[in-house]
Amino acid sequence: MLIKRFKMKLGTKILCLVFVVILLFSASVGTVMLKEITESMKQMATEKAKGDLALSSTYIDDVMSGDWQVKNNKLYKGQTQINGNEDIVDLLGEKTGDTITIFQGDTRVATNVMKNGERAVGTQASSEVIAAVLKKGKRFYGQADVAGSSYQTAYMPLKDQNGNIIGMLYTGANQSILASLTQSLFTQFAIVLVIVIMVSVILVLVFTRKINKRLNALKSAFESAGNGDMTIEVSDKTGDELSELSVYYNKMRMKLNDTIQTVQQSALQLASASQQLSAGAEETNQASEKITEAVQQIANGAQDQITRIENSESSLKQASADIRDISANTAAIADKGQLAQSKADIGQKEIANVQAQMDAIHQSIQKSGEIIHQLDGRSKQIEQILSVITQIADQTNLLALNAAIEAARAGEQGKGFAVVADEVRKLAEESQQSAGQISKLIIEIQKDMNRSARSVEHVKTEAAEGVTMIQRTRDAFKEIAAATGEISAEISDLSASVTNISASAHQINDSFAANTADIKESTKNTRQAAALTEEQFAAMEEITAASETLSQLAEELTGIISQFKMINQAENG
């Protein structure tokens, strides 16, 4: 109860924490600052006392000429008596704002320090000051007790003309001034502290309000998720830890949503499978009953089968003998088929040789035709040459005639030339006659070559037809050889098959005997199977009961999962 009563929210905790931290920090800073300020003020007061001491000493030297001296047990400055001289100390006190005292030895003889409402004349300085100033001849600066009050003081020794210390000059600032100044600073610090605390509280409130808003969004999302609603998504893009927490929540939400949907689908599948299992078990029970009846029928029919097998065994032996005869006949047919295939192969080779010879004859005829064609061309060339020779002979005869005429004109000088021209004419005439005879022979040769060309063409046609017929004959022999080979192969396969059938028949005959024993054993096993089937029927009844229980569990799981609101359901809604 106490824990619940003092339970605070996160914003209140942060506010209290910030408040405590500010207070501790302010207290620490205030303490250090107060100490530093106090020390600084004391230092400033001491420095002021130093300056005022020098000012007072200089002022006294200015207004009072002469050395310090003691006459008639009185302290003098020059000719001015210091004992009871209140004017000088009051004047210096007004100028400096300090307390001023002039000592004769260690005793105050002139001072503006008040004690119990009177000037503290006749009182002594503190032992610390006496030891430092009067005995050691040094100046003293610092805090000292003055007539029962604490001051920041400055002391200097007063010496006569011989250098003997005969007294002291003192200036001091009262600590009450420091106390009031310190109190004023502390008051200002407290005011600033209160302002800082108020501003901090406001900033913390604004900050915690924003955080509370973001935390409330997360809280609402987690609360909805706890109640089964997975549709709420938290969007926080500030980039801090709460933003990361939002991202992790969204990832968790999606993962949990997928997991629950998977479980839901699995539960539905489980329910469906359990129903199918129950239905299958029921069908199996029915099938088991039918199997029991069938097994019993099989057992009853096994004996009848044994009787039929024994009757078939004698028939199988006769079939085996017939198969052996078929195997022998098939082997003889296979030998004849191989012989026919051998003859077909020989005929195919002979046809191939004849075709090769016909191809050679056909090629020779083609070459003869080409040669005759070439001779016809050559005879035409010779005919052209003879024509040229005839033309040359005609021209030569004409030239010889002209030469004879010219020789006759020349008389005796042309007789020799006339003889030569006559011989040339004779040669030209003989050339013409020879060319005519050759032309006749060439015409006869051309006629013979034309007849030969026609004969060669006819022979070529006949040879081509012979090659075609031989090719057809060769193709026919190939088909005969192939068919004979196929028949031989089929006969060989048939022979092998018959041999295998014969062997199988022997095996079947042997197997019938073994099967008879196996069927007897099977009958025994069938009766045992009937008993096992009854046991299986009882087991299937147990499976049916278990599947019904599984179906109930699946329905309960589906009901539990239906309490969750999925993301896909919200989108479809």
From Swiss-Prot:
It holds the Pfam family MCPsignal. One of its GO terms (molecular function) is transmembrane signaling receptor activity. Keywords: Cell membrane, Chemotaxis, Membrane, Methylation, Transducer, Transmembrane, Transmembrane helix. The keyword Transmembrane helix applies. GO terms for cellular component: plasma membrane. Residues 1-13, 208-573 are cytoplasmic. Disulfide bonds: none annotated. InterPro entries: Chemotax_Me-accpt_rcpt (IPR004090), HAMP_dom (IPR003660), MCPsignal_dom (IPR004089), sCache_3 (IPR033463), Sensor-like_sf (IPR029151). The modification Glutamate methyl ester (Gln) is found at residue 276. It comes from the Bacteria. Residues 209-261 form the HAMP domain. One of its GO terms (biological process) is signal transduction. Its main location: membrane. Coiled coil: none annotated. It is found in: Cell membrane. Residues 35-188 are extracellular. The chain crosses the membrane at residues 14-34, 189-207. The keyword Nucleus does not apply. Belongs to the methyl-accepting chemotaxis (MCP) protein family. This is Methyl-accepting chemotaxis protein TlpC. It comes from Bacillus subtilis (strain 168). The gene is tlpC.
